[in-house]
Amino acid sequence: MTTTTPAVAVPTPTRKQRRASEAAESAHQKLSSPWASFAAVVIAVLWTIPTLGLFISSFRPEDEVKGSGWWTWFTNPSFTFSNYDAVLNGSDTDLATFFINSIVITLPSVVIPITLATMAAYAFAWMKFPGRDTLFVGVFAMQIVPIQVTMIPLLSLYVSPPFGLPSLAGSEAFGGGFYTIWLSHSIFALPLAIYLLHNFMKEIPTELVEAARVDGAGHVRIFARIMLPLMTPSIAALGIFQFLWVWNDLLVALVFGGGNLDVSPLTVRLAELSGTRGQDWHLLSAGAFVSLIIPLIVFLSLQRYFVRGLLAGSVKG
């Protein structure tokens, strides 16, 4: 007796899925071409040369740094750790306090905006409420405004009643504090973070969310059980960008820190290392590489999430 295996119906790809597949294949071919590889190598070399020069200068003696260019090291190599010793152990530098301040500033300035942006992006993407589209356009438009334009009005809000925050500002004569720097970085980061995370959420299949709703899941459960696991690469990529932005920031720390050395990050101290006339920039080169340690560790630790986050949602049908 012969048994017949029933044929399994294979779903036909939709037009949107076919366009997305064709676009992905076209992008793959372009990025894997010899010309694309050559361009990537050229850009990498051009990007690396200044960093290499700074690295070599950080190990050169002071008189050679001031007397000749870093490229002369290849014909007359000489090494010294005196620059790093002066930066790390010098009585006038004291980088340890500023290093800790940078960590204290950076961590909340990354966690706060990403947490708020993730929840706001879900609301814009999957919740219906009056004025949703208009409000989202307003959030998108906020990216156009340069942060330098908003600094003076924002600083006025911090210190002026009835909307001011005297407890955060410290006193009538604004002295700055960690809270004002955290809040400022969060405000500046939210528009772009909401926009990027919203676009990623919109790429999640509607069927997945509808199936969860059929099973009785509410918005909180859908957000926690479905969205967050799928968004891990995008959140990590955005977190790296925000971390690097805050860690390397000087302007926001100077303006909203109020010149208070107790809350000044490492970048403020690095700016002072070169001296009032830039005569000690050999110390600045060593201090710059000391400040690279934490960002380098963060990037290497989250590199795989960073690449996946950049590619997530990049091809739209």
Predicted regions and their residues:
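A hydrophobic, multi-pass inner-membrane permease signature
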Residues: 2-317
